[in-house]
UniProtKB/Swiss-Prot annotation:
GO BP: carbohydrate metabolic process; cell division; cell wall organization; lipid glycosylation; peptidoglycan biosynthetic process; regulation of cell shape
Similarity comment: Belongs to the glycosyltransferase 28 family. MurG subfamily.
Residues binding UDP-N-acetyl-alpha-D-glucosamine, per UniProt: 196, 288
Gene behind this protein: murG
Protein name: UDP-N-acetylglucosamine--N-acetylmuramyl-(pentapeptide) pyrophosphoryl-undecaprenol N-acetylglucosamine transferase
Keywords in alphabetical order: Cell cycle, Cell division, Cell membrane, Cell shape, Cell wall biogenesis/degradation, Glycosyltransferase, Membrane, Peptidoglycan synthesis, Transferase
Pathway it works in: Cell wall biogenesis; peptidoglycan biosynthesis
Function text: Cell wall formation. Catalyzes the transfer of a GlcNAc subunit on undecaprenyl-pyrophosphoryl-MurNAc-pentapeptide (lipid intermediate I) to form undecaprenyl-pyrophosphoryl-MurNAc-(pentapeptide)GlcNAc (lipid intermediate II).
One cellular-component annotation, GO: plasma membrane
Main location: membrane
HAMAP family from the UniProt entry: MurG
Length: 354
């Protein structure tokens, strides 16, 4: 039986593509393994998926670009993670390793390279993060959402890999009619999506301006915090959704989102009006700011700095999007930067030598 190892974690964005590819390998009879942090979001997501995946937990550390005593400890954690990964991969003897990035992916990538296992990695952002900069040195091939410098000879530019448009599931979740009964059909609907680590700013904005917002809009707020769950007049707040995600997206006139590339390209593929509020440099390396500027320059989106986000500025930006809806939708419709999961899977299998 052929075997493949997946790795990647730390945020949902470092797991999503793996969970889209894994079922295709399982359907072809592959034995699938996943190396990550047993206490990380990758383990949680793999378990939630219900997929037949063998999960292996390793030590992980975050290498920082600035001096920190924590770095010294984390170097040892990464080293131990490499030793653990060497043992795991040597026992599995896989045909390939696929990495979606995040610091937990560095030890398995290094170990696979040392064991002469082909390593395939994916980079979603405009510029590589530190983890993938390290991983690139050990990779067989890197696939990128955005074009990368020609000097990176192992890179294949594939565009954004998204599942949008690949499902015909039109089943109405049982919660949807109840939600709709609380909404005013004459008002536009705003959907706030903060991702696994960026919802707090949106949550605070809505909590502080709930009455004013719900006078003008139906508000859907994916909070990541179950203590905020609420269904009221023109307001639906929920911590997490699965089968409701696409129906709620379909309801929205405008989506207010962070700047993660996975979410951005899903919105572009759906031709969904959106306002980007990227995570600032105090909370990230600035990749979301770069993604947001890129999307705005392409005419797909509008973006606003987190420090400038207020009730008043939100009204201005949403009004601008709605007034020029045709412009943004047409630009998204003309995008050639989207690739289906099936197309990417076929490319990956071809590069793996089938």
């Amino acid at each position: 039986m052929k075997k493949i190892v997946f790795t990647g974690g730390g945020t949902v964005g470092h797991v999503t593509l793996n969970l889209l590819l894994i079922p295709r390998f399982l359907e072809e009879g592959w034995e699938v393994h996943y190396i990550g942090d047993g206490n990380g979001i990758e383990h949680e997501q793999v378990v939630k998926s219900g997929l037949d995946v063998h999960f292996h937990s390793i030590a992980t550390g975050k290498l920082r670009r600035y001096f920190s005593f924590q770095n010294m400890l984390d170097v040892f954690k990464v080293g131990f993670g490499v030793l653990q990964s060497l043992t795991i991969i040597a026992k599995i003897r896989p045909q390939a390793l696929f990495s979606k990035g995040g610091f937990v992916s560095v030890p398995p990538v290094i170990a696979a390279n040392l064991l002469r296992v082909p390593v395939f990695i994916h980079e979603s952002d405009l510029t590589m993060g530190l983890a993938n900069k390290i991983a690139y040195k050990f990779a067989t091939t890197m696939y990128s959402t955005f074009e990368q410098p020609a000097s990176l000879t192992k890179v294949k530019h594939v565009g954004a890999v998204t599942k949008v448009g690949q499902t015909n599931d039109k089943v109405t979740p049982i919660q949807l009619p109840e939600i709709l009964s609380h909404f005013d059909k004459s008002l536009p609907t705003l959907l706030f999506v903060g991702g696994s680590g960026g919802a707090k700013v949106f949550n605070d904005l809505i909590s502080q301006n709930s009455a004013a917002l719900t006078e003008r809009f139906n508000i859907i707020n994916l909070t990541g915090d179950s203590s905020l769950n609420k269904l009221d007049k023109n307001l639906y707040r929920v911590d997490y959704v699965t089968e409701l995600y696409q129906p709620l997206m379909d309801l929205a006139d405008v989506v207010i989102t962070r700047g993660g590339s996975n979410t951005l390209f899903e919105l572009i593929a759906m031709q969904q009006l959106h306002l980007i509020v990227p995570l600032g440099r105090q909370a990230s390396r600035g990749d979301q700011i770069e993604n947001a500027l890129y999307a705005e320059k392409k005419g797909y989106s509008k973006q606003i700095d987190e420090s400038q986000l207020t009730f008043a500025s939100l009204l201005v930006e949403v009004d601008e999007l709605l007034k020029h809806k045709e412009f943004y939708v047409q630009n998204m419709a003309n995008s050639n930067e989207i690739q289906s999961v099936d197309s990417f899977y076929n490319l990956l299998r071809e590069d793996m030598g089938r």
